[in-house]
A protein has these predicted regions:
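An anion/phosphate-binding loop that grips the pyrophosphate of nucleotide cofactors and donors
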Residues: 25
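Nucleotide-activated donor-binding/catalytic signature segment of Leloir-type glycosyltransferases, i.e.
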Residues: 1-13
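Short alpha-helical segment that forms part of, or immediately flanks, the ligand-binding pocket
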Residues: 19, 38, 42-46
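A charged, aromatic-enriched C-terminal amphipathic alpha-helix characteristic of glycosyltransferases
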Residues: 91-124
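Short hydrophobic beta-strand element within catalytic cores of glycosyltransferases
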Residues: 50-55
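Aromatic "clamp/platform" in nucleotide-sugar-dependent glycosyltransferases that forms part
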Residues: 14, 33
């Protein structure tokens, strides 16, 4: 409210309706100094939402290159605004983006099975 964004930006807070929210987005903007592998970025790509990410998000997190633009925080507000404008003009098939995420090795079925196996192996060695 202080910044006068209430008509342009929605701050959801906690929600259990992430897929519905992602489907409604025009763009996903994620400025960050440093990240590991942010699930929200992966979910946005899987939903086919154009993403603008900081270079603080590792390239490993870019599963859908045609839907993602990365730039440094130091590029400034103008460069970020331009990147958001480009994201808003991107047109691609959301199903194609979801397929790209699966093909990149981030399918929940594959990663859940791998993680289960990893923990079971770890438990056996203890």
């Amino acid at each position: 409210e202080v910044a006068g964004l209430e008509g342009d930006v929605v701050f959801f807070g906690v929600t259990d309706r992430v897929p519905d929210v992602l489907k409604a987005l025009d763009a996903f903007v994620f400025p960050s100094f440093s990240e590991g592998l942010p699930m929200s970025v992966m979910e946005a790509q899987a939903a086919g939402v154009p993403c603008v990410l900081s270079t603080g998000v590792p390239e490993l997190a870019v599963a859908v290159p045609f839907a993602v633009e990365r730039l440094p925080l130091e590029a400034g507000a103008g460069a970020w605004a331009d990147a958001v404008e480009r994201a808003l003009s991107k047109r691609f098939d959301r199903a194609e983006a979801a397929a790209a995420v699966r093909l990149s090795g981030f399918d929940i079925r594959d990663t859940a099975a791998w993680l289960e196996s990893y923990y079971l192996d770890l438990a056996e060695t203890q």
